[in-house]
Amino acid sequence: MYNFNEAEYRTNLTRQIDTFGQGVELAKEITKDGYSNIFFIAVGGTVAMMMHFEEIAKQLTTIPVYAEQAGEIVLTGHRHLNRDSLIIMGSKSGDTKETVAAAKWIKDNYGCRIASMVISKESPLGRLTDYQLPLVVFKGVEYEYLSVFGLFYGLLHLHNDFPQINAFEEQLKKLPDLLVAAQAKFDAPAAKIAARYYQSPYLMWIGGGELWGEIYLFTMCILEEMQWMKTKSIKSSEFFHGTLELVDENTDVFLVKSVGAARALDDRVERFLNQYGKNVVIIDIKDYMGDIDDAFAPILAPVFSTAVLNGRLSKYFEKNTGHDLNMRRYYRQFDY
């Protein structure tokens, strides 16, 4: 596969999966001390990743779970935020200014416990963190999901909402093989897609359910930030309430199909696109998940989505555009 170090990828995934038990132990400590609700708070791609947990929580638990934008919550507040709230934050660098400011605001105003997905405990966010969620590498969103899984599903298990936690952990052990296989399967399609669409003036991306955060993340953080490509992301549930009018024979449209309860919405969009679109790419994440148990497929779908989209398609866009994924005009280049 192009620009892919399989041995390193397998090693890092295994190291990250091995931290699952640490997250469960944190969940035991937090549950023993008690908590009233869970707030996921971050910005950008990290809060996009967190949207998945909010969506899954609606379906699995009565624990109130919120995903909030760090730059907004310090201005608007939240009536459900209280001293007993558990805050889950994330900033790989540990110095994302809005996230650090939100952590300080939370500590100063509420004194909440904060669990953070951060590499260094000595970073600005790390120093405000009570529980560090292990993160073994800087790049790769799949590692971010895996970093949070132990704590989140440990909390749900201890709340009697996720009795299948041991079976879930066994599923995680399959991921090194299955994620490599998924990327190998999508490698040739990714090369063809990128070669055809890398010069597109406008890319529409549609998705929903447990994958909505992934669609938002890939369009904004990868295609826009890292490739300077103009995109539109829209939920499958919202597509028929305006955005459908933009579809014609010249519109480049991507639909990423989810595997959970909202899949029927993706199916409806697919039928419309097949009838009225000309330049349509359908990426069905279910096709890349191997023998993952159906019970865990919605939980793990974003891990596979990020593996094929970020892991394969972004690399081929980079190859075709000649635009290094690390190049920025503005982001972190100066104060603004």
Predicted segments, located by residue:
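Phosphate-moiety recognition in structured ligand-binding domains
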Residues: 2-7, 269-336
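Active-site phosphate/pyrophosphate-binding segments
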Residues: 2-37, 139-140, 147, 154-234, ...
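Glycine-rich, charge-decorated loop segments at or immediately adjacent to ligand/cofactor-binding or catalytic sites
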Residues: 120-133, 243-246, 289-299
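Glycine-rich phosphate-binding loops that contact phosphosugars or nucleotide phosphates
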Residues: 36-171, 256-283
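Internal helical hairpin/lid segments
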Residues: 213-281
